[in-house]
């Protein structure tokens, strides 16, 4: 199977080039940022009726930003960043002053933020035009974008299948040539999982290294913004733009940004000699789709052929990660989403003079939240209630500690861990929507990393022999060693060419 949207469907070659290539053309003045940005806007107009990657397209704002870059470059100024002039798609969970921020929920339909998220600000300061805001599961809760209040995103590899979630819109935009760069968020796999399903690269940075200021919270101890693109180098270049300490975010870590771009360039020689790669036993077993395991084993053998030493690693508490995650996350959701009450911003429903303030709040939340968001609020409220807090929430936090300890012990033996990113390739839209447990299981391989706050990457590892659909290889690195992902990821990418 091929992705016709990149292989056959792009009439303008600018929409198939990498971000690094586009930056080189723009900075040498062979093309203008306006030309590149307009090509991608035209691409969105041509194919987004099929894909539904975008919830909002800001044509005027994007072209104005591109013109500003061109003006500065024509005046002889140095580029504001290595990606200046290259347009980007932004997940609709980061606040923007010039476009609606909805988190794909009716609760925030049409909401205009009075401030930019720190990630948004850094993108603007880097001279990167924002094409628009991408589709997602409502408040980042879901694995398929089917929880979006505005309809699901379709996978460019097969329009009947999911592009993943929660950030399926960002990854689908990359895979369809609608954007060369995109930003997502990862709470339990929402960057890495869509990347795997769409044959793109997605990175969850170490928790605290990318600011969460202006990121609409799902679960504050798990959420992390991150970069996604079509190559490892492009992803590294974007990572460098958005990372760094932010005084507006109390969870932001004040330490130097890992040398991710340097690592990606060094890894491009394809040499993995001296690298110890750990294969997580818990993620390499029966029950996964045969084509996924076949591609994963081939990837491990490729790394061995590139000089890596392969070691099997046992992380016994990973088996308990799913249960712990789906207790901790709803508890944080029930607290974070209490702010959406219809009183200060967003939707207000039923305020017709016949209801009390409490009744208006209850009615607003009933009308504004979708079924999955309501499910998680109820579950979290229950788990935090008197008599259940110790039995559920505290137990889940203890498991979280054990998972972090499993990772720590593993990194005493190896430099990096690997697993399939997802247990199967992209499933058909509607296939799991009535079975929450089946949907939750799809994040089995990605969520342990969020519980431990570590760094992870998904990158293409071929097509499954049984479905012909993309398979992702997940790399997992210790905290603040994000550069390891890029060094190993770039080497693996080079070995596949």
UniProtKB/Swiss-Prot annotation:
Entry's Gene Ontology BP terms: translation
Keywords: ATP-binding, Ligase, Nucleotide-binding, Protein biosynthesis
InterPro entries named in the record: Amidase (IPR000120), Amidase_CS (IPR020556), Amidase_dom (IPR023631), AS_sf (IPR036928), GatA (IPR004412)
UniProt keyword Cell membrane, yes or no: no
Active site, per annotation: 91 (charge relay system), 166 (charge relay system), 190 (acyl-ester intermediate)
Superkingdom of source: Bacteria
GO cellular-component term (any): glutamyl-tRNA(Gln) amidotransferase complex
Class in the EC hierarchy, top level: ligase
Gene Ontology molecular-function annotations: ATP binding; glutaminyl-tRNA synthase (glutamine-hydrolyzing) activity
UniProt key word Protein biosynthesis: yes
The reaction(s) this protein catalyses: L-glutamyl-tRNA(Gln) + L-glutamine + ATP + H2O = L-glutaminyl-tRNA(Gln) + L-glutamate + ADP + phosphate + H(+)
Span list, region Disordered: 143-171
Catalytic activity, EC: 6.3.5.7
NCBIfam families membership: gatA
Family to which this protein belongs: Belongs to the amidase family. GatA subfamily.
Function comment: Allows the formation of correctly charged Gln-tRNA(Gln) through the transamidation of misacylated Glu-tRNA(Gln) in organisms which lack glutaminyl-tRNA synthetase. The reaction takes place in the presence of glutamine and ATP through an activated gamma-phospho-Glu-tRNA(Gln).
Subunit-level organization: Heterotrimer of A, B and C subunits.
Name of protein: Glutamyl-tRNA(Gln) amidotransferase subunit A
Native source species: Corynebacterium glutamicum (strain ATCC 13032 / DSM 20300 / JCM 1318 / BCRC 11384 / CCUG 27702 / LMG 3730 / NBRC 12168 / NCIMB 10025 / NRRL B-2784 / 534)
Higher taxonomy: Bacteria, Bacillati, Actinomycetota, Actinomycetes, Mycobacteriales
